Curated annotation (Swiss-Prot):
Self-association state and partner proteins as the record states: Component of the small ribosomal subunit (SSU). Mature yeast ribosomes consist of a small (40S) and a large (60S) subunit. The 40S small subunit contains 1 molecule of ribosomal RNA (18S rRNA) and at least 33 different proteins. The large 60S subunit contains 3 rRNA molecules (25S, 5.8S and 5S rRNA) and at least 46 different proteins.
Lineage start: Eukaryota, Fungi, Dikarya, Ascomycota, Taphrinomycotina
A Pfam family per the record: Ribosomal_S19
Residues where Phosphoserine is found: 63
Gene3D superfamilies reported in the protein's UniProt record: 30s Ribosomal Protein S19, Chain A
GO biological process: cytoplasmic translation; ribosomal small subunit assembly
Functional note: Component of the ribosome, a large ribonucleoprotein complex responsible for the synthesis of proteins in the cell. The small ribosomal subunit (SSU) binds messenger RNAs (mRNAs) and translates the encoded message by selecting cognate aminoacyl-transfer RNA (tRNA) molecules. The large subunit (LSU) contains the ribosomal catalytic site termed the peptidyl transferase center (PTC), which catalyzes the formation of peptide bonds, thereby polymerizing the amino acids delivered by tRNAs into a polypeptide chain.
Domain of life, source organism: Eukaryota
InterPro entries: Ribosomal_uS19, Ribosomal_uS19_CS, Ribosomal_uS19_euk/arc, Ribosomal_uS19_SF
Anything else known: There are 2 genes for uS19 in S.pombe.
Protein name (record): Small ribosomal subunit protein uS19B
Entry's Gene Ontology molecular function annotations: RNA binding; structural constituent of ribosome
Annotated Gene Ontology cellular component terms: cytosolic small ribosomal subunit; nucleolus; nucleus
Amino acid sequence: MAEENHDEAVRVAELRKKRTFRTFAYRGVELEQLLDLSAEQLVDLFHARARRRMLRGLGPNASRFIRKLRKAKSEAPLNEKPATVKTHLRNMIILPEMVGSVVGIYNGKLFNQVEIRPEMIGHYLGEFSITYKPTKHGRPGIGATHSSRFIPLK
């Protein structure tokens, strides 16, 4: 009896060790299948704004950017991250073939390095490079209110 409980406990522990990772799916389509889709089929999966942008065409700058990403990926050693490709194209829609690339997205001052993950498909590059410095609200300054005048200054 004790031996059966021990065997079952070992089996349960092994099942816990073997973690199953959730595979990413964009709108019900897995990443491997997304890479195989044609442009027309991929456009049908995007939200309306991205679908309109793709149907009107990405333009020469976006095409040049994708070529640079492909080149960086092909030149990268096996199991290594590709070289960073810098861009000002904040309005570029993230496509499935961009997954795994490292992109330097310009925020108006510097290039923020972002590794493209599957969860980012369909979003814009600019969403991942904030253009402003969030405010850190501290103490009120002089002239804020009458009561704040009595707060000692540092």
